[in-house]
């Protein structure tokens, strides 16, 4: 699967980490930061930085809290993002990537440019 990821994207790489190391691996920024470059051909992109920021700001902890339903967790995560003045596209992209990684959805997230194009098309 790791070979396939090099041709794919961040959401698939995050799902690989969850499948190989468990959901709690996403709580460990150092582990994620060490693994992602190998999975993504050493491409540390804007999107990757956004995920690292989400880990640092406690977003993943909120998503993994067993006291929250998936929907409640996403709403609480959005509140944290908004308190940090994170743009809506960044919020949605990161939450969609993490939702895919956690198995909450089977919709793989595209590259950021493709994602933005789909959002713009959907909103028009």
What is the predicted role of each segment?
Residues 2-119:
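Charged, amphipathic alpha-helical regulatory modules used
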């Amino acid at each position: 699967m790791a070979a396939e990821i090099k041709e794919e994207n961040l959401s698939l790489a995050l799902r690989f980490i969850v499948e190989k190391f468990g959901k709690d691996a996403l709580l460990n920024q150092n582990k994620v930061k060490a693994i992602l470059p190998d999975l993504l051909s050493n491409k540390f992109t804007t999107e990757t930085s956004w995920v690292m920021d989400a880990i640092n700001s406690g977003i993943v902890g909120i998503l993994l809290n067993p006291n929250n339903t998936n929907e409640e967790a996403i709403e609480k995560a959005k509140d944290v993002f908004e308190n940090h003045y994170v743009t809506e596209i960044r919020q949605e992209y990161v939450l969609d990537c993490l939702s895919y990684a956690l198995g909450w959805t089977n919709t793989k997230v595209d590259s950021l440019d493709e994602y933005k194009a789909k959002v713009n098309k959907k909103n028009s």
